[in-house]
Amino acid sequence: EQFHKVSLFYFFFSSTLPPVSKGRILIVTYVFPPEEEGVGMAAYEMACSLSSLNWDIHVLTRPLDSPEEPFRSRPYSPLTTLPDTLTKDSARLREYLNGFLKDFRPDVIIYHSWADWCREELLDAARDSGIPFFLRSHGTATNFRSFFRLNHPPFFGLKKWFCSFFQIRRDILNVCRKSPLNRLVFLDPYGTLFKSFDYYCASGRKLAHYSCIPNTFPALKRTAPFFRGKYGLSSAPVFTCPASASMRKRQLLFIRHVKRTHLQQITFLFLIPQRNSYAEQMEQAIGDDPRFRILYRLPRPEVEAAITESNAVFLYSFQEQQPLSILEAMSCGVPWFAPDAGALSTLEGGIVLKNASPSTLEKAVESLTDETTRETLGRKGLRQWEARYAPDAVDRLSLIHI
């Protein structure tokens, strides 16, 4: 009878219990948000994904340039920073890492970088401690056509790309020969040019073990509206671009194209984590045009509120292998538009721009001012996210095997 009481108690209250941790993962990356470079953001996405799948995450990285920046701060990613004075002294670094791993005792280490920051020392420490050492490779769902256009990589900087590509990939994969504990880790079980080369090299080295880290995170939740009122945004449609200011994101080109259209009574909102010289050029290009707003250094809750309260989210990049902001919009049913680049054309719930021109942009924006169109696209995006990117869907599909 006592057993049945305990069983019933667990049955009724198990849904309120916190999820059981699957273990500890140490992510090692030489840059991590708030810095907005590709490796840093990809490491952030990976930390977010694994945390959503009930892993305890700890990040080992370099000191942040802006430690006070709250843009991407999350409580699930405690940080340990290694100063340059330590990482440049190999003997001291090895001693520190041995002690760190002994105290922290991660179940697995994921090294995330194309650089060799602390890699050899960490690999030795992992081998001595018997901790599996995973190497994170590139890879996400990709429409291969997007790679074979004159304004997209690899044709963008073709000579440099070819000269560096094979050596970089070989150097990374050579790490896997130094320990039987090594594995390759991929962001997604879909092919890219990078990943195909990795598979080819791994097969030649008889590396049979691969792990997949899918791109997943908890859905953005719609809360009571406050963002528009706080920042004085009118009732006009708001289209939001949550991306760092850079040439790769092409916000300047977007501004110039909008100015060549007849679009009116629309606010194009740029959420930029750090003001830089490119952002200053954006400010100059905008001038006193009321259609544009830039907000800097918003805390993460306000970034999420901006997305959920937007009529649409947009990007204008020429390369998007990990379109996190688009996936975030899909998770809460917000439509999007973006150029046909990288993984974007495989996603639903938005409008893919076949080319970057004022006329194409104007047509897409006008379509998204229609409420019925927005609702239809939003539902499509949400369905795809729930079926493929939501944490419970990822767990069901067993895409990750650590």
Segments (PLM) and residue ranges:
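Short hydrophobic beta-strand element within catalytic cores of glycosyltransferases
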Residues: 335-338
